[in-house]
Curated annotation (Swiss-Prot):
Subunit note: Monomer.
Name assigned to this protein: GTPase Obg
Compositionally biased region (Acidic residues): 353-363
Assigned protein family: Belongs to the TRAFAC class OBG-HflX-like GTPase superfamily. OBG GTPase family.
Native organism: Rhizobium etli (strain ATCC 51251 / DSM 11541 / JCM 21823 / NBRC 15573 / CFN 42)
Function: An essential GTPase which binds GTP, GDP and possibly (p)ppGpp with moderate affinity, with high nucleotide exchange rates and a fairly low GTP hydrolysis rate. Plays a role in control of the cell cycle, stress response, ribosome biogenesis and in those bacteria that undergo differentiation, in morphogenesis control.
Record-linked Gene3D superfamilies: GTP1/OBG domain (2.70.210.12), P-loop containing nucleotide triphosphate hydrolases (3.40.50.300)
Segments of this protein annotated with the region Disordered: 332-363
Length: 363
């Protein structure tokens, strides 16, 4: 499946139906009075986070979503039918932005979260609504209110427990393939990985999700290479695994290059816990390995792990270190404050939404 992490979408909710101008007509009833019903409410446009998706590719082929209009009211005080809602199914981790691409509307981080992006117009009142003691036969009704329309941006930030970062050919995809069932493209040339890959790793019967993103090079924050846009996919991780290839001539410089790009990107990536590992050590003899390990330790300020996806050396130790930090970060996580919502805007989970489907159906 092709990967797409950003999409532009046009949405429009349904217009409300017009109220009816009608009078009761029955035999032997000379002045039946008004009986025009109200118009139906237009359909809403919703967005919902669902499992089983990890790309926005569907929105490349369909960019327009319109809810149906409410039907007009009818005589005998019959209210028009409400318009049908439209729901955009998106992956968990999708953010919705206004057309300026900066104003966030909502952030869907859990399965089943829903948000109303555009409310349908209310139906107009029929002439029966306007009957008073001084006007027994009003001959007017309200038109339905128009729906809302807007252009929005969908931006996907994958949700994973740990993120892999490093220069191109640092062995990130090889690491992912060796500890999970993911099958990313692996080759001996830079930028083999062109989009993020996810995999589930298991150590000591504990599972966690790893995210592999394309490699960073010097100047990535300025658009060099394929830029740093994919760093958004490791913003939500608990810990970063920074891989430095043992084949680099200067491993200390390689580490600092990636670290500088993380700092330039911002969004508190450098504040995340970090595990540093010297990868692809199977290509070195012991003397060279000792030398490069010492150089990398000096650059990062800690003793790096030594790993090889080919021989399996050090792999379990790294996974356990990742697991321990993830468990600790999850235990220390503070509940997020509920966002301030506008009138009638809702973010609800699927279980809280049961039995409330008709709550907003009144005109």
């Amino acid at each position: 499946m092709k990967f797409l992490d950003e999409a532009k979408v046009y949405i429009r909710s349904g217009d409300g139906g017009a109220g009816s101008v009608s009078f009761r007509r029955e035999k032997f009833i000379e002045f039946g009075g008004p009986d025009g019903g109200d118009g139906g409410r237009g359909g809403d446009v919703w967005v919902e986070a669902v499992n089983g998706l990890n790309t926005l590719i569907d929105f490349r082929y369909q960019q327009h979503f319109k809810a149906t209009i409410g039907t007009h009211g009818m005589g005998r005080n019959r209210t028009g039918a409400n318009g049908s809602d439209v729901t955009l199914k998106v992956p968990v981790g999708t953010q919705i932005f206004e057309e300026d691409r900066e104003t966030m509307i909502c952030d869907l981080t859990e399965e089943g979260q829903r948000y109303c992006l555009a409310h349908g117009g209310n139906g107009g009142f029929g002439n029966a609504h306007f009957k008073t003691s001084v006007n027994q036969a009003p001959d007017w009704a309200n038109p339905g209110l128009p729906g809302e329309e807007k252009t929005i941006w969908l931006r996907l930030k994958l949700i994973a427990d740990a993120g892999l970062v490093g220069l191109p050919n640092a062995g990130k995809s090889t690491f992912l393939a060796s500890v999970t069932r993911a099958r990313p493209k692996i080759a001996n040339y830079p930028f083999t990985t062109l989009h993020p890959n996810l995999g589930v790793a298991t150590v000591d019967e504990r599972e966690f999700i790893l995210a592999d993103i394309p490699g960073l090079i010097e100047g990535a924050h300025e658009g060099v290479g394929i830029g740093d846009r994919f760093l958004g996919h490791v913003e939500r991780t608990r810990v970063l695994l920074h891989l430095v290839s043992a084949q680099e001539e200067k491993v200390g410089k390689a580490y600092k290059t990636v670290k500088h790009e993380l700092e330039a990107y911002g969004n508190e990536l450098t504040d995340k816990p970090e595990i540093v590992a010297l990868s692809q050590i199977d290509v070195l003899d012991e003397a060279e390995l000792k030398k490069k390990t010492k150089e990398l330790a000096k650059a990062c300020g800690r003793t790096p792990f030594q790993i090889s996806a080919v021989t399996g050396r050090g792999m379990t130790e790294v996974l356990r270190a990742l697991r321990d930090i993830i468990v600790q970060e999850n235990a220390e996580e503070k509940p997020a404050k509920a966002p301030k919502l506008r009138h009638r805007d809702m973010i609800v989970s699927e279980e809280n939404n049961q039995g409330e489907d008709g709550a907003d159906d009144q005109p």
